[in-house]
């Protein structure tokens, strides 16, 4: 769990920026989105395969350059 303590004399905006960075580093947002609804095993597999195809196309495009 991301936790940021407000340091003495520190503006709230700086603490908020540190909190957002910590949340991104811990992939909390991605985890919440993943658990927001149930995916059937077949759907999970299709999503995973689609991501793999996308990744492979991107890699092939990079190698052509």
Curated annotation (Swiss-Prot):
GO terms for biological process: translation. The keyword Ribonucleoprotein applies. GO terms for molecular function: structural constituent of ribosome. InterPro entries: Ribosomal_bS21, Ribosomal_bS21_sf. Keywords: Ribonucleoprotein, Ribosomal protein. The keyword Protease does not apply. GO terms for cellular component: ribonucleoprotein complex; ribosome. It comes from the Bacteria. NCBIfam families: S21p. Belongs to the bacterial ribosomal protein bS21 family. This is Small ribosomal subunit protein bS21. It comes from Acidobacterium capsulatum (strain ATCC 51196 / DSM 11244 / BCRC 80197 / JCM 7670 / NBRC 15755 / NCIMB 13165 / 161). The gene is rpsU.
